[in-house]
Amino acid sequence: MWIIVTYDIGIKRNTRVRKICRKYLCHVQKSVFEGEISEKNFLKMKGELQRIVNFDDDQVAIYVFDTLRYSSKEIIGYHIDTDNVI
């Protein structure tokens, strides 16, 4: 599956959330990650995030795509190269 993760997190938890997302996805903007992820890793990442997020103050939005067949991405401005990510 392909996912996009965006977040609005309190300062104290921001670094921890970013480190978790970086383990599984490509960092494309300050609070945005995207990439291909297995179901197993998706559930692991979600569990790690749920343990950190303050449900009253923070928000993590995860957009899940089963296929990229009918999708496209347009970037206006500088482009971050994600092709070299393992």
Regions found by a protein language model. Name each.
Residues 1-41:
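Extended, hydrophobic alpha-helical segments
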Residues 10, 27, 36, 45, ...:
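Generic signature of intrinsically disordered, low-complexity segments enriched in small/polar residues
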Residues 30, 35-59, 64:
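Short, intrinsically disordered low-complexity segments
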